[in-house]
A protein has these predicted regions:
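Beta-rich carbohydrate-recognition and catalytic domains
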Residues: 1-141, 145-200, 205-245, 266-322, ...
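Extracellular glycan-recognition regions
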Residues: 2-5, 36, 243, 257-260, ...
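Beta-strand scaffold of nucleotide-dependent catalytic cores
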Residues: 263
Length: 472
């Protein structure tokens, strides 16, 4: 089965993605989430793409080991190729019935090999757990790479010290090997003493900089990165250290076509409601990392994805100016947006303007729907909605004191008083990018249809471009 732009193996879901670049083809291994009881275990499935637009499902490639096996759940890992052309897959082996001394289930590093990246042979004799000093229940997401300072191999993974402050034991542990089978611990790659742990770590080089990418759920559920001139650190925090918001998690990357492409999952919500709690796993999506002059990374939708929506649907014929220094103003188009559409807009605003918004799937009054709101004074963009959560029958029984989807905000420099906005909407999936540098992704359910519009609060703005495009 082939899907366009996004991928989900319906009726199931995509968990963590493990990208591997195989020439011009990207092999995207992913944790297959079935959400059935009794649980079916977690296998690796494979989907491939050669253009970031069309995704071809290849099915299961690394099965669950079965009810009694150490790898009943085959969780996140990585793939590398050795000097002889053999491929090595490292993954997290877990069985809820096999417990550590503290009563939590053990996590182990397991190994498999292949000659074609599709048929994998497991090597249970190579499985190993956490060494002394590390928590045996947090030993996951192995990422293997050739040691840039030597002739061997390094393996980093999400780990925790066995002692210390409960919420700050997280460490990116590191092991080394000469043969890709026997591993010995060495000094951690990064020991920030800040997070519960740093999930799905990966390391790559771009130009003169090295980047350490990880996902965390301590301060926020988000994928972050650090940067260094050396693969050993020190690891510096850029001003904007996140890849996306709460709705795009466990992002990992591969080099493709001379570019760095990240793949994560847009999180789903319980009962497919905007008020439903976030769930693990969702729909696969891609973002491209672009290196700025100072080494920091901007993120945007790949051009191939945007170009997949090239059939004109609506075009704003003349600039639209709106606003007032003392009130809110909005304007809404007449036609209902298609369910699968790209929106492109250019906005400019006067100094001191408080809010500039793109209304998405809104009603004719611009009242009910979703809002991508730019807030220059706060240097942020947020995804909002109306109505917010209703918890009673009275007029004031709404979450009016919750200013937006609280997890869905991104820092952004809006001092230039202009913004280029790219929005992709495909059924319940929403992916926004401002100035081709800051992205915000989400699943949205409560407003399945509506119009596009613009709004301004306490100031004035001009929309110089507003176009919508259908899939080609």
């Amino acid at each position: 089965m082939t899907q366009q732009v996004f991928f989900r193996p319906r009726p199931d879901w995509v968990g963590d993605v493990i990208p591997y670049s195989d020439g011009g083809e990207l092999k995207l291994y992913y944790l297959h989430e079935c959400r059935r009881e009794p649980t079916c275990g977690t296998p690796w499935h494979l989907v491939t793409t050669t253009d970031l637009v069309h995704y071809e499902e290849r099915g299961e490639v690394l099965p669950s080991g079965g009810d009694g096996a150490e790898d009943f759940n085959a969780y996140t890992g990585s793939v590398v190729r050795d000097d002889d052309g053999e491929y090595h897959l490292y993954y997290t082996a877990n069985n809820p019935g096999r417990l550590a001394p503290d009563g939590r289930s053990l996590q182990l590093v397991a190994h498999a090999t292949s000659t074609d990246l599709v048929t994998w042979v497991k090597h249970p004799e190579d499985t190993f757990g956490a060494p002394e000093g590390y928590d045996p229940a947090d030993w996951r997401d192995p990422f293997v790479y050739r040691d840039p300072d030597g002739e061997g191999w390094s393996l980093i993974l999400a780990a925790r010290h066995s002692e210390g402050a409960e919420r700050r034991r997280g460490v990116v542990a590191r092991l080394v090997s000469d043969d890709l089978r026997t591993w010995r611990p060495t000094a951690p790659l990064w020991d920030p003493r800040r997070f519960i742990t740093q999930e799905c770590p990966e390391l790559f080089r771009m130009g003169q900089w090295w980047y350490l990418v990880y996902s965390e759920f301590t301060d926020r559920f988000v994928t972050r990165y650090r940067m260094s001139r050396s693969p050993q650190g020190p690891w510096l925090a850029p001003e904007r250290d996140t890849i996306d918001g709460r709705g795009f998690y466990a992002a990992k990357s591969a080099q493709w076509d001379g570019r760095r492409i990240f793949f994560g999952w847009i999180a789903s919500r319980q009962d497919e409601r905007d008020d439903g709690r976030w769930l693990w796993a969702g729909t696969l999506a891609a973002l491209e990392a672009v290196q700025a002059a100072d080494g920091t990374l901007d993120f945007r939708q790949p051009r191939e994805v945007l170009e997949a929506y090239s059939q004109p649907d609506y075009h704003l014929r003349a600039p639209l100016r709106m606003g007032s220094a003392e009130r809110y103003e909005s304007a809404v188009l007449t036609d209902v947006l298609p369910r699968d559409v790209r929106i492109e807009a250019d906005l400019e605003w006067e100094p001191g303007t408080r809010e500039i918004s793109l209304l998405i799937r809104t009603d004719s009054e611009g009242e009910n729907g979703y809002v991508l709101r730019l807030e220059p004074a706060l240097s942020r963009m947020v995804l909002d909605r109306w109505p917010r959560q209703v918890h009673g029958t009275e007029q004031w029984h709404i979450s009016g004191d919750v200013p937006h989807f609280i997890e869905l905000e991104r820092p952004i420099d809006l001092a230039g008083r202009r913004a280029h906005i790219d929005v992709l909407i495909k059924n319940e999936l929403l992916q926004c990018c401002v100035n081709r540098s800051v992205c915000l992704s989400a699943s949205v359910y409560d407003h399945p249809s509506g119009r596009v519009g613009l709004a301004v609060l306490d100031g004035a703005a001009t929309c110089t471009r507003l176009d919508t495009f259908l899939a080609s």
